[in-house]
């Protein structure tokens, strides 16, 4: 089966390179589109700053996430169609992107650390509700 648009759920971690490499290995032979989705870090989870500082911190973290996605795409040696930075429930965003952008394969990491354990839970939700194929990739780095 050939896919036409692959959505890769990544995090601002080195393991994301493995996920994108898997996507590129599937996409390149059939010239499929590859897009990336990640969760925005919420500074409220990590800090107890005053409200005005939170907005500044959110902006900085959003910019760092954008820079990471850009760098990830550059290192992939394959064009990235779109990037999405989601907040809230990742699985809902993945399902919405699949519908709106005609994604036919979602790739998620299977990992036990913070983001990826949340993404893995999201992957279970995506698998149960998805109308498209979902590939769970085992990640090194424990």
From Swiss-Prot:
Keywords: Cytoplasm. InterPro entries: Rossmann-like_a/b/a_fold (IPR014729), Universal_stress_UspA (IPR006015), UspA (IPR006016). One of its GO terms (biological process) is response to stress. The keyword Nucleotide-binding does not apply. It is found in: Cytoplasm. Its main location: cytoplasm. The keyword Cytoplasm applies. Coiled coil: none annotated. Pfam families: Usp. GO terms for cellular component: cytoplasm. Belongs to the universal stress protein A family. Required for resistance to DNA-damaging agents. This is Universal stress protein C. The lineage of its organism: Bacteria, Pseudomonadati, Pseudomonadota, Gammaproteobacteria, Enterobacterales.
């Amino acid at each position: 089966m050939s896919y036409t648009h692959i959505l890769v759920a990544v995090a601002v971690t080195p393991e994301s390179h493995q996920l994108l490499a898997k996507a590129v290995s599937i996409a390149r032979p059939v010239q499929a589109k590859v897009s990336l989705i990640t969760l925005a870090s919420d500074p409220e989870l990590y800090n107890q700053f005053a409200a005005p500082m939170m907005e500044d911190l959110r902006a900085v973290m959003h910019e760092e996430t954008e820079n990471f996605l850009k760098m990830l795409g550059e290192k992939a040696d394959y064009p990235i169609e779109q990037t999405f930075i989601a907040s809230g429930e990742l699985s809902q965003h993945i399902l919405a992107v699949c519908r709106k952008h005609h994604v036919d394969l979602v790739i998620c990491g299977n990992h036990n650390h913070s983001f990826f354990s949340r993404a893995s839970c999201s992957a279970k939700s995506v698998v149960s509700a998805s109308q498209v194929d979902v590939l769970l990739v085992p990640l090194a780095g424990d």
